[in-house]
Design a protein with these regions (language model features):
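CheY-like receiver
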Residues: 118-134
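Active-site charged/polar residues at nucleotide-handling catalytic sites that mediate phosphoryl
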Residues: 43-44
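Two-component/phosphorelay signaling modules centered on CheY-like receiver
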Residues: 10-30
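Conserved phosphotransfer microenvironments
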Residues: 14, 34, 47-70, 78-87
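Short alpha-helical segment
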Residues: 36-38
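C-terminal output helix
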Residues: 98, 102-112
Length: 134
């Protein structure tokens, strides 16, 4: 079970993503502000942070703080949102730049991939097996 931090102001989109991630067995957390997201990240570092594309353009230093907490970064934008390209130094920090909600299946696949890599490299301890009812 991967801990995923969703940061943004589009509550409907984030709630839908959180439900999809929870249904896939992950532990999503929603932060509606940057400050709240940074506090949540510092308290319990997430495996992945999903951040709005506009935030990466406006405040790239936030990405460095999230990375320093050990989180991989995914950026998202919505239909009709900002389509300006990311500066090269920001591009190198992020795993993917997704168009949500259209690419929500790609988001789930990336979460599974990062979780698998974290388990393989020993970053995340495997969960103990469920006790069997005999």
């Amino acid at each position: 079970m991967a801990r995923i931090l969703l940061i943004g102001t589009d509550e409907a989109l984030l709630e839908g993503l959180a439900q999809s991630l929870a249904a896939a067995g992950h532990s999503p957390q929603i932060a509606t502000s940057v400050v709240e997201g940074l506090e949540m990240s510092a308290a319990e570092p997430p495996l992945l942070s999903v951040v709005p594309h506009s935030l990466a353009l406006a405040r790239p230093e936030v990405l460095h703080v999230l990375l320093s907490n050990g989180s991989a970064l995914l950026l998202y934008r919505t239909l009709g949102g900002d389509t300006s390209p990311l500066p090269p130094r920001v591009q190198r920090l992020v795993l993917a730049d997704l168009m949500l909600p259209l690419e929500r299946h790609r988001l789930l696949a990336l979460v599974q991939f990062v979780e698998h890599r974290a388990r393989t490299t020993g970053r995340v301890l495997p969960e103990p097996p469920e006790p069997r009812a005999d």
